A protein has these predicted regions:
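Juxtamembrane interface at the cytosolic side of transmembrane helices
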Residues: 316-361
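Soluble extramembrane regions of membrane proteins in the secretory/endomembrane system
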Residues: 33-303
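Hydrophobic H-region at the start of alpha-helical membrane spans
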Residues: 8-16, 313-317, 362, 408-409
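Short, Lys/Arg-rich N-terminal segment immediately upstream of the first membrane anchor
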Residues: 1-7, 303, 345-351
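An N-terminal hydrophobic leader/cap segment in hydrolases
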Residues: 3-42, 50-52
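Alpha-helical transmembrane segments of integral membrane proteins
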Residues: 358-613
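Juxtamembrane/start-of-transmembrane alpha-helix segments at the extracytoplasmic/lumenal side
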Residues: 300-314
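Alpha-helical transmembrane segments of multi-pass membrane proteins
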Residues: 22-25, 322-326, 367-376
């Protein structure tokens, strides 16, 4: 990539991002037939919800439409279920897709059990929609809720909550129907279901990793007591109660608010919302309970086109960092940090080669076997965040676990590097100047200022894209999204500690494995594998055990393992950037500074966060 080509490549990247973001927005609005608007809803105790309102133009005061509240699960924002919002709104249903409390742009909650006691905010949305005259284009007798995982728990809790309220007041339930995806082990006792006067649909992954918590310890719902209670709650005469469920069969009557159906698709828990069969089943359910006529076929789906477009934007936005940085390095103030690329390292031979692979294995094993222990340690060190209480002391429960793992592995990597260099490398032709560590204090400061500028430009473009098109950069649930200003404070809190890992990775890749300055794909792939193999080993252990025994290897820690679906791709591609930035500057510092700021802000803005109100 030559200096003369940098402006053209940068312009090309920005153009691609704009074009595919516009296309994603076009799909999201159903080719202009649905208006998508971000709204803020004030709720109890000074709390608030951020939400996206999908209003079909066919929904009017003369022709009011049913409404569905979409509730993402734990660690998810409203964008992660935009596919469902798109398909429901295409079929004439008004959708309010919320950021659950303590996630996305919504505030924290004073409740430590927000999904159960507040429906992650859904209770307040239903109350508002039912009571206000502002939403005169919705049919208040047909308000539904749906959610995945913990969002599914919120949905069934809503059916119980509004059922109790209706019986107490002698009225009908405000919640006409609920659809619960990916959650069944809580919220379905006889006590929970007794007051429900809403239709209920269930979709549960046959290969759900959390199925060990179910009564029968697996995901097959045909004989599951939890699912049987759901179906039998619609049958008044106990003599007619069933002992085995027919998957996909509708029981009960929608008009009497006792319709029940159970789906059991062959899919894993985290990928359940992004499956066409799962989507079709849920669309069929809402068409049935709302008695919709002349709607689109359930298999007529367009949501994946948006995912393709935002995926392209995601990838290109990260590629854009390279020409952007090269262009910025041509500014005289920053040009001073560029140094000649150090001589390549001598390839290890004999004992050196053996030592190289021993250290490679040690690093991988340490990475693999410290992740779950660090996750458990985070619960002890960060008690308030782990208890879902509002706090300024590292308020991100799940990222705290990743942070501890990153610190430990970063320190271990630095120790291994220093020890191998002192005991072996220094004596076998590895000079200090080959490592890319030598830098003046003034140059280090300029490097840091450049990283901040790259970070700012990157996110300014993202905010502009979101303002223009109301989409972000996203591959399913892996997203780079806009953030609240308070997240900049958290970046100052978290980034320095994560930086230990990022710097150690840059040093490892460029200071111990740079046997060539030619960035061939096989070299980059090896570097990516070297960085991520420990975490990949965790995923392999988890799912090989799961498919052989029916139970995941780490049960109580399965949600932490699920985090790795988003973390591993980031870790794998990290060396790609560290290699390129090293080639630009001749030092190991710029790469980890830029990637730490960009990637950690992505982590911070996509997780639960218990910041005080």
């Amino acid at each position: 990539m030559t200096a003369n080509n940098n402006p053209r490549i940068l312009l090309f990247c920005i153009s691609v991002i704009i074009i595919f973001s516009a296309l994603a927005s076009y799909v999201q609005s159903s080719a202009g037939k649905v208006r998508v608007t971000e709204i803020t809803i004030p709720t109890q105790d000074g709390q608030w919800l951020k939400a996206d309102l999908y209003k079909p133009f066919t929904a009017t005061s003369e022709n009011p439409a049913p409404m569905v509240v979409v509730i993402p699960g734990f660690q998810r924002s409203k964008e992660t279920l935009s596919n469902l919002s798109i398909e429901l709104s295409r079929r004439g249903i008004v959708v309010i897709s919320i950021d659950p409390y303590a996630q996305g742009g919504s505030s924290s909650s004073f409740s430590t059990r927000a999904a159960t006691t507040e429906g992650y905010g859904m209770f307040a949305v239903v109350d508002y929609a039912y009571e206000t005259n502002n939403l005169n284009y919705i049919d208040k007798t047909r308000i539904g809720a749906t959610g995945h995982s913990a969002g599914g728990l919120a949905a069934i809790r809503g059916a119980t909550y509004f059922g109790k309220e209706a019986k107490k007041n002698g009225t009908v339930s405000k919640l006409h129907s609920v659809f619960v995806s990916g959650f069944i082990y809580r919220g379905f006792t006889k006590k929970d279901l007794q007051p429900v006067s809403s239709n209920i649909g269930i979709s549960y992954a046959l290969y759900d990793e959390g199925a060990y918590r179910n009564k029968l310890k697996h995901g097959d719902l045909r004989l599951a007591p939890e699912a049987l209670r759901i179906i039998n709650s619609s049958i008044n005469d106990k003599k007619n109660h069933i002992n085995e469920i027919t998957i996909g069969k509708y029981y009960g009557n929608s008009a009497e608010k006792n319709l029940r159906v159970v789906y059991n698709e062959k899919v894993l828990h985290p990928f359940q919302p992004y499956n066409r069969e799962v989507m079709a089943n849920q669309l069929m359910y809402f068409e049935q309970v709302f008695d919709l006529k002349n709607t689109l076929s359930n298999n007529n789906q367009i949501w994946y086109w948006k995912e393709i477009c935002t995926s392209i934007s995601f990838i290109v936005s990260l590629i854009m960092l390279i020409p952007l940085t090269q262009l910025m390095l041509n500014i005289p103030f920053f040009e001073r940090i560029k140094k000649p690329i150090p001589n390549i390292l001598p390839k290890p031979e004999g004992k050196g080669k053996i030592l190289f692979w021993i250290l490679f294995a040690i690093s991988a094993l340490v990475a693999a076997f410290t992740f779950i222990p660090m996750s458990e340690l985070s619960k002890t060190l960060f008690v308030e965040a782990s208890s879902r209480k509002q706090t300024w002391f590292f308020p991100q429960r799940m990222n705290n676990a990743i942070m501890l793992w990153a610190i430990l592995n970063g320190v271990v990597s630095l120790i291994i590097f220093y020890t191998s260099y002192r005991l072996f490398g220094k004596k076998n032709g590895v000079l200090f100047d080959m490592l890319g560590l030598r830098i003046k204090r003034s140059e280090l400061l300029r490097t840091f200022l450049l990283a901040i500028m790259i970070f700012a430009i990157y996110y300014i473009l993202l905010f502009t894209i979101y303002f223009l098109f109301h989409v972000d950069y996203r591959i399913f649930f892996i997203g780079i999204r806009i953030f609240r200003p308070v997240m900049l404070l958290l970046l100052v809190l978290y980034a320095p500690l994560f930086f230990i890992f990022f710097l150690s990775n840059s040093l490892r890749i460029n200071g111990t494995m740079r046997f060539s300055n030619d960035l061939q794909w096989k070299t980059l792939f090896f570097h990516g594998l070297a960085t991520s193999i420990g975490l990949l080993l965790i995923i392999c252990i988890q799912y090989v055990t799961f498919f052989k025994t029916g139970t995941v290897f780490w049960t109580d820690g399965w949600l932490y393992v699920n985090l790795l679906f988003g973390v591993v791709p980031m870790i794998f591609f990290l060396p790609f950037f560290h290699n390129y930035f090293f080639q630009m500057t001749g030092t190991v510092y710029l790469g980890p500074m830029i990637t730490c700021l960009v990637f950690i802000m992505s982590l911070l803005s996509n997780t639960v966060c218990y910041i005080p109100i």
